[in-house]
From Swiss-Prot:
Belongs to the sulfur carrier protein TusA family. PROSITE patterns: UPF0033. Coiled coil: none annotated. Signal peptide: none annotated. Gene3D superfamilies: TusA-like domain (3.30.110.40). This is Putative sulfur carrier protein HI_0242. The active site is at residue 12. It comes from Haemophilus influenzae (strain ATCC 51907 / DSM 11121 / KW20 / Rd). It comes from the Bacteria.
Length: 73
């Protein structure tokens, strides 16, 4: 399944903590799309994926104010 989590209103480290909490509730092969603002530390999600044994499927700019990170459990 695919899930989405809008974290644009949050500042670091809350997006990382929220993503970690959400991933705990997902099944293997589920995907989690994270919507972040540019103030979020989006580069940290590469490290986060490695440390939490999840795949970083994709990262891209959705607009000037939103960055998308897709993780797969």
């Amino acid at each position: 399944m695919k899930y989405q989590l809008n974290l644009t209103a949050l500042r670091c480290p809350i997006p990382l903590l929220s993503a970690k909490k959400a991933l705990k509730n997902l099944d293997k092969n589920d995907e989690l799309m994270l919507i972040l603002n540019l103030e979020s530390a989006v580069e940290n999600f590469s490290i986060f994926a490695e440390e939490n044994s999840v795949a970083l499927v994709e990262q891209y700019y959705a607009s000037e104010k939103e960055f998308i990170v897709i993780l797969k459990k």
